[in-house]
């Protein structure tokens, strides 16, 4: 019971209308000195702007018919609540020696909970079609520590699409971990010029085994299934194109 007396005394002192606990040291050190100290404390616990560069996946995807190099990463700058985020994803075909896809997103990211950010901005596809899109999405951590990144995209031609990625980190040791990953695409309408049908369009399901050489760098190997779904699968099948493949991947994750 004696251990609780100091806390009760502080509560009683504060409740009598005297100086708040936050400002009690002003009487000893002076209000000006303590105000500066409080500003430093607040700065380092939420007001300080920081930045980061993260390469989620830089990998070689080796399939039966084609080898592709994939880059998936982002850069951000800001504080705990608001950030500027630039995301990029690019696919380069080693067989055709050309970029098959290049997209860049510039987003404002605002924290709506300790674990989720709402994001809004623009996306531009440099390849394959040069279209721009408005973006509205969510990124963060779901219950049971699933990392999620999902968004709706409205193109300049009025087409509405969406995509979501889920990833989970299963630690085997302090450095060795397994990364199951899934991705799903969706379209509100048929987009014939892009070979996309209404409904769920494509999916990916893979697993990677990674090892943290240092905390900022982790090479990995893995396997991933990639396939078209629904009406998109029918469109591609009718055109004589492959609708699914399994690829082996080798690459790394890094951040700074």
Positions of PLM-derived features:
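Repeated loop/turn-to-beta-strand initiation elements of outer-membrane beta-barrel proteins
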Residues: 81-86, 114-118, 144-148, 173-178, ...
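Detector for outer-membrane/organellar transmembrane beta-barrel domains
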Residues: 131-192
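Outer-membrane beta-barrel "beta-signal"
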Residues: 207-212, 242-256
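Hydrophobic, lipid-facing positions within transmembrane beta-strands of outer-membrane proteins
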Residues: 51, 69-73, 102-106, 132-136, ...
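Residue-level signature of outer-membrane beta-barrel architecture
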Residues: 77-79, 110, 124, 140, ...
């Amino acid at each position: 019971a004696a251990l609780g007396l100091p806390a009760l005394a502080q509560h009683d002192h504060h409740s009598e209308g005297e100086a708040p606990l936050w400002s009690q040291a002003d009487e000893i050190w002076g209000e000006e000195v303590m105000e500066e100290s409080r500003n430093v404390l607040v700065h380092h616990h939420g007001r300080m702007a920081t930045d980061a560069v993260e390469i989620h996946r830089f990998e070689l995807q080796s399939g039966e018919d084609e080898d592709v190099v994939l880059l998936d990463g982002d850069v951000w700058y800001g504080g705990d609540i608001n950030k500027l985020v630039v995301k990029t994803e690019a696919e380069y075909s080693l067989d055709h020696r050309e970029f098959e896809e290049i997209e860049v997103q510039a987003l404002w990211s605002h924290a709506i909970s300790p674990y989720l950010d709402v994001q809004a901005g623009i996306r531009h596809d440099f390849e394959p079609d040069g279209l721009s899109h408005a973006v509205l999405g969510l990124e963060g951590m779901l219950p049971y520590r699933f990392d999620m990144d999902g968004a709706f995209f409205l193109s300049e031609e009025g087409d509405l699409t969406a995509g979501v990625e889920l990833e989970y980190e299963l630690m085997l040791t302090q450095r060795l971990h397994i990364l199951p990953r899934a991705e799903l695409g969706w379209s509100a309408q048929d987009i014939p010029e892009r070979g996309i049908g209404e409904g769920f369009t494509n999916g990916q399901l893979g697993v990677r085994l990674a090892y943290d050489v240092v905390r900022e760098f982790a090479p990995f190997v893995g396997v991933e299934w990639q396939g078209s779904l629904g009406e998109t699968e029918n469109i591609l099948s009718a055109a004589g194109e492959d609708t699914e493949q399994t690829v082996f991947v080798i690459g790394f994750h890094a951040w700074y």
